[in-house]
């Protein structure tokens, strides 16, 4: 039987939510009630699968962990009042920490003036953010298109490459095995995990995948495409594969890919949605090899953990295909004043506090600790790797990885697996993590591994 709409029910639910938003604290009964409501609403109206996923990585199989607020720059507090060191970082959005006061203030100040733009008049913050990114990004990158997410920034990059290369008779895209570029139809065509791809086949034609980090495979693919008339429009890749398991290519790989793109007349699209904004110890990961892409994709941390912001930055030569008709690719909310205020404040914080350098220093400290633990627990840990504050611990099997996340939850440290490699647990904290908190994370990791060893030996 069809359910009839209920304005009264919707009004009551929204009023209840607004009341919660106004509250700073909850008493015990309110916390219990909120937990029950959230679990029920996720089950009935969001997706029950999220509950089972959360159950698999929380202590005691309890999926009732409901976050309530940021505790500090680097911590989260749940409705039970438990504080967790955030080593997940919202999959890389909290580079400048949770509720960074500079970012929050910029957004609040802009909110007091104008939350969204008219769509007709020229909006100043979009212009200022584009100018700032032109100054910040490497090489000849100059023009920016703004969106709301990483997958949107990749979609814009693919369409831009198509618009530029189609008149040249080039329609093929080369991506890499293990890649993750998003889940909308175009970006999913570049993503490499069958779990995400198969339900939506056929995807966009013209995409090929080669092994990541294998420059000879890349050369062969470009050469074979040229021989068959399937000339390559662009190569798209991540400087470090994030969801693939924090996979670092051999030194010099990006440089070699750049040379191949130049040789075959293909554009180089770098997806720095996860590696950008200081995460790896440089503002952009491509700067470790001084590589300059034709198109750069940003999102996640660009909004400072306060607003969703995506950006696709390109050279003038490439971007100029949109000059005659700037409406060829647009989005209603991309580049809105609140998002641009957040992005400008985020860049300011990253530069003022030199957070990329801090990411390098604290990342080295953490990785040294993880490598030492990997040597001590070879029966559990297969590898520890990373660059800056983008790290991973890979376990010998999936179950140990899940159990490790659960044990870390007991230690009040939040971690999770990578989407394309479930054996691998990512360590991706805010760049503002303190030295003391780094030490706490290493202690928690040691305790979690010790508990896992006992558990494995008992089975």
Swiss-Prot record:
The gene is patA. It catalyses: an alkane-alpha,omega-diamine + 2-oxoglutarate = an omega-aminoaldehyde + L-glutamate; putrescine + 2-oxoglutarate = 1-pyrroline + L-glutamate + H2O; cadaverine + 2-oxoglutarate = 5-aminopentanal + L-glutamate. The keyword Transferase applies. The keyword Transferase applies. Its EC number is 2.6.1.82, 2.6.1.29. The lineage of its organism: Bacteria, Pseudomonadati, Pseudomonadota, Gammaproteobacteria, Enterobacterales. Belongs to the class-III pyridoxal-phosphate-dependent aminotransferase family. Putrescine aminotransferase subfamily. Keywords: Aminotransferase, Pyridoxal phosphate, Transferase. Pathway: Amine and polyamine degradation; putrescine degradation; 4-aminobutanal from putrescine (transaminase route): step 1/1. PANTHER family: AMINOTRANSFERASE CLASS III (PTHR11986), PUTRESCINE AMINOTRANSFERASE (PTHR11986:SF112). It comes from Citrobacter koseri (strain ATCC BAA-895 / CDC 4225-83 / SGSC4696). InterPro entries: Aminotrans_3 (IPR005814), Aminotrans_3_PPA_site (IPR049704), Class-III_PLP-dep_AT (IPR050103), Putrescine_aminotransferase (IPR017747), PyrdxlP-dep_Trfase (IPR015424), PyrdxlP-dep_Trfase_major (IPR015421), PyrdxlP-dep_Trfase_small (IPR015422). One of its GO terms (molecular function) is diamine transaminase activity. The modification N6-(pyridoxal phosphate)lysine is found at residue 300. Catalyzes the aminotransferase reaction from putrescine to 2-oxoglutarate, leading to glutamate and 4-aminobutanal, which spontaneously cyclizes to form 1-pyrroline. This is the first step in one of two pathways for putrescine degradation, where putrescine is converted into 4-aminobutanoate (gamma-aminobutyrate or GABA) via 4-aminobutanal. Also functions as a cadaverine transaminase in a a L-lysine degradation pathway to succinate that proceeds via cadaverine, glutarate and L-2-hydroxyglutarate. Pyridoxal 5'-phosphate binds at residues 150-151, 274, 332. Its cofactor is pyridoxal 5'-phosphate. One of its GO terms (biological process) is L-lysine catabolic process. This is Putrescine aminotransferase.
């Amino acid at each position: 039987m069809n359910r009839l709409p209920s304005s009264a029910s919707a009004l009551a639910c929204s009023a209840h939510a607004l009341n919660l938003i106004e509250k700073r604290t909850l008493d015990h009964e309110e916390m219990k009630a909120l937990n029950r409501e959230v679990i029920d609403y996720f089950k009935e109206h969001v997706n029950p699968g999220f509950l089972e996923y959360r159950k698999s990585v929380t202590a005691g199989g309890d999926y009732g962990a409901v976050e309530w607020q940021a505790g500090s720059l680097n911590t989260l507090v749940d409705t039970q009042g438990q504080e967790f060191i955030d080593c997940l970082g919202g999959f890389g959005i909290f580079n400048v920490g949770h509720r960074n006061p500079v970012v929050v203030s910029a957004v609040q100040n802009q909110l007091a003036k104008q939350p969204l733009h008219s769509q007709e008049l020229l909006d100043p913050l979009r212009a200022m953010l584009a100018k700032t990114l032109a100054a910040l990004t490497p090489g000849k990158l100059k023009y920016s298109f703004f969106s709301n997410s990483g997958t949107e920034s990749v979609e814009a990059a693919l369409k831009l490459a198509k618009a530029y290369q189609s008149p040249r008779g080039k329609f093929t895209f080369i991506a890499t095995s293990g890649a993750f570029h998003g889940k909308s139809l175009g970006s999913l065509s570049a993503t490499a995990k069958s779990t995400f791809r198969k339900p939506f086949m056929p995807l966009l034609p013209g995409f090929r995948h080669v092994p990541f980090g294998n420059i000879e495979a890349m050369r062969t693919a470009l050469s074979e495409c040229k021989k068959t008339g399937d000339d390559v429009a662009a190569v798209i890749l991540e400087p470090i594969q994030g969801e693939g398991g924090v996979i670092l290519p051999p030194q010099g790989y990006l440089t070699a890919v750049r040379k191949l793109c130049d040789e075959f007349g293909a554009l180089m699209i770098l997806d720095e949605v996860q590696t950008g904004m200081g995460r790896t110890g440089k503002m952009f990961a491509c700067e470790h090899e001084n590589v300059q892409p034709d198109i750069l994709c940003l999102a996640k941390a660009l909004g400072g953990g306060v607003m969703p912001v995506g950006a696709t930055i390109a050279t003038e030569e490439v971007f100029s295909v949109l000059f005659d008709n700037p409406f060829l690719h647009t989005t209603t909310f991309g580049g809105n004043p609140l998002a641009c205020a957040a992005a400008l404040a985020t860049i300011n914080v990253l530069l003022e506090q030199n957070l990329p350098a801090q990411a390098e220093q604290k990342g080295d400290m953490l990785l040294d600790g993880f490598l030492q633990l990997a040597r001590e627990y070879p029966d559990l840990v297969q590898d520890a790797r990373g660059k800056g504050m983008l790290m991973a611990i890979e376990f010998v099997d999936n179950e140990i990885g899940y159990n490790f996340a659960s044990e870390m939850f007991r230690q009040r440290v939040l971690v999770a697996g990578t989407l394309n490699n479930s054996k691998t647990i990512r360590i991706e904290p805010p760049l503002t993590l303190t030295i003391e908190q780094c030490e706490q994370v290493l202690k928690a990791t040691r305790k979690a591994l010790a508990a896992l060893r006992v558990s494995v030996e008992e089975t």
